[in-house]
Amino acid sequence: MQEQYNPSEIEALVQKHWHDNKTFEVTEDANKEKFYCLSMFPYPSGRLHMGHVRNYTIGDVVARFQRLQGKNVLQPIGWDSFGLPAENAAINNKTAPAPWTYQNIEYMKNQLKLLGFGYDWSREIATCTPEYYRWEQWFFTKLYEKGLVYKKTASVNWCPNDETVLANEQVQDGCCWRCDTPVEQKEIPQWFIKITAYAEELLNDIDTLDGWPEQVKTMQRNWIGRSEGVEMTFGVAGSDKSFDIYTTRPDTLMGVTYVAIAAGHPLAELAAQTNPELAQFIEECKNSTTSEADLATMEKRGVATGLYAIHPITGKQVPIWAANFVLMNYGTGAVMSVPGHDQRDYEFAKKYNLSIEAVIKPVDGELDISEAAYTEKGVLFNSGEFDGLDFDGAFNAIADKLVAEGKGKRQVNYRLRDWGVSRQRYWGAPIPMVTLADGTVIPTPEDQLPVILPEDVVMDGIQSPIKADKEWAKTQVNGQDALRETDTFDTFMESSWYYARYCSPQADQMLDPTKANYWLPVDQYIGGIEHACMHLLYFRFFHKLLRDAGLVNSNEPAKQLLTQGMVLADAFYYNNDKGARVWVSPLDVVTTEKDDKGRVTKAIDKDGNELVYTGMCKMSKSKNNGIDPQVMVEKYGADTVRLFMMFASPPELTLEWQESGVEGAHRFIKRLWKLASDYVAQDNSEALDVSKLTSEQKALRREVHKTIAKVTDDIGRRQMFNTAVAAVMELMNHLQKAPQTTGQDRAIIGEALTAVVRLLYPIIPHVSFTLWNELGNTNSIEDSQWPVVDESALVEDSKLIVVQVNGKVRAKITVAADADQASVEALGMADEQVIKYLDGVTVRKVIYVPGKLLSIVAN
């Protein structure tokens, strides 16, 4: 065995073995328990970053652990390879998105292999290939036939200069990123999938996701946003028109003093015909943001329409205002405003001098709305026949009255909107719909699928090549001329079903149900919590669509979800001659001084610039604080990088990148290597004989088996990989101090090392593979079994008891494991140190905590 640990040499050899033996390629096996481990697949941006490495190391640790449990483990990988970044890169590099994407895939694939991840590469998929998106197109046509797909107009960002649609990322400070023209909102026809048809099931089934983090489940519940309320009809004074409003607080109905409607509401547009100020306001709203996050923080503005609404119970007339905080595509596009009991309505009423009336008061205490609205539930007053009712009583009484008079109905609403899947981009899967010469819109016939996206294109940075090329859209359907849809799918479409395609990636159908139902659902899914409300919701939705199409027989796509934390690194900058910040990579910082608490007080880069240290923050290109994994692998080896990633932090928390920690991980592996090397060099022919062991040898063996038990629980149940590593490190300290003089000494070290390399195999597989062989095992470590705890080794012959006198530790005594209190007391009282502290005093009380503590109280 080589004395020195040489990571680059052993990692290349081990990776070649895995490749040549197709170690991680699996097929269905009804005789073995399956385990499907999946990490969210990467976008092929060009290079892996440390966030990828953390995600994929966690996944690989879980997969390798389960493999050694004897399970049939599937761990696939692929590429989420459509999307806007490829278009931008193609424009900048004067190429097309396809070659840029495929080149990146090859580079990143090599990086993944260098890190030693045990993927079944025979199942690799790239979502930008027709072999993949063909089935997505096919499934979309089936959803259309089931009535789950429809087309309607929706708002997009429009650049009037380039006459093109912009993604949100291409709008910078309200202007086009390319030509700096102010961006407008434009209504264009787009395709939607009815996720709202599954809202109730998506919400209810969250309760079945026992293996998902509570935070993710709460975020999804809030995103789906089920509410119970009343939809009521308000008349419009002086006309036969009416409009509907939904509220979850009908108890406040008697306090309505105005109604707010969206700028795009038909009533606002009607009133604007004779109101220039309103017309201008509507135009401004059209070109402003419509995201809920922005609405919450932006200035609330409005214009009176001159119209009045008729209160459905009192008949009182209240003014109708067009307001920028009401969205036409959310709810009914109108809200009843109760400034006495809603803070936003209160601030708007104060700003425009509108009436504020209180109709709810606290059960106890005084009502005060002089500075703010009273928004709590309470008791009604100033509400006529409803006075004195609490929230529930008022809700029911007012709802019943509105229903009885034909002016309202009880209703369950969801915050969730239907999924708009149209994108006016090029690099995406073409939407498989065609428009016939007579204007009829139908799905592309199955025998014409896939609708292939041309890859040999020129990007002008303005218009999608398939929109610019009028010939591409022309086709024939059933002998008739037709035009193809030139929008492409939202890339969340591809990532919503990729996990299922891995089960049968070569199948000449969307899924092979037999294979899919063997592997699905995913047993362990790993990815960032930032995907909680988009990808992870569409992922669940698509699984239900697949189930209802008869392709899978489970209700949910993944049993367990682990959301790993971000990777942070130090960030440094200096100000250049123009006062602009220049961010410097931590790898280029050559001098740092720290205070006694370890905080950086001074830093200088390799060019001599004195730097400002801004602390730890998420690795990013903008702050130039990303650490290239490849640089670290070349310097320390893949196993060291993997070990640091698992040891530095619990998986759900942020991980602070510290090269000193990486160096520590490297030293630990070298210690393990040396211990194994020293052991292998000796005569280890004597077999372990438990009956011959001394108490010291039994104690060391007990530590080995306690470590096996802890690591098994930490990785398998708790998923606390950092404490698993810490436990092995602690055991290593014991092993390094242990004598290797006798045959039984070495037999225990041998048992310990064969356990340790298997315990660490999921985390540092190259070293473990090599040491397993060096320790004389004839089978491959991948075909071995996870170490099993010898329960008899955990049984202690003796216990160490702490002896206290008046609350202070005065001695530690060793007693037989089965010693009773009288025996322990006798031994404790006979200890020299204890005798000294009891001299001249009277023992008043003795407390014994079995197996742990003897406490003597004396005065």
UniProtKB/Swiss-Prot annotation:
Compartment list: Cytoplasm
Top-tier EC class: ligase
UniProt short sequence motif 'HIGH' region, positions renumbered to this chain: 42-52
Family annotation (InterPro entries): aa-tRNA-synth_I_CS, aa-tRNA-synth_Ia, Leu-tRNA-ligase, Leu_tRNA-synth_edit, M/V/L/I-tRNA-synth_anticd-bd, Methionyl/Leucyl_tRNA_Synth, Rossmann-like_a/b/a_fold, tRNAsynth_Ia_anticodon-bd
GO BP of this protein: leucyl-tRNA aminoacylation
Record key words, sorted: Aminoacyl-tRNA synthetase, ATP-binding, Cytoplasm, Ligase, Nucleotide-binding, Protein biosynthesis
Catalyzed reactions per annotation: tRNA(Leu) + L-leucine + ATP = L-leucyl-tRNA(Leu) + AMP + diphosphate
GO MF term set: aminoacyl-tRNA deacylase activity; ATP binding; leucine-tRNA ligase activity
Motif annotated as 'KMSKS' region, chain positions: 618-622
KW S-adenosyl-L-methionine (keyword) present: no
UniProt family annotation: Belongs to the class-I aminoacyl-tRNA synthetase family.
Protein known as: Leucine--tRNA ligase
Species of the source: Shewanella sp. (strain MR-4)
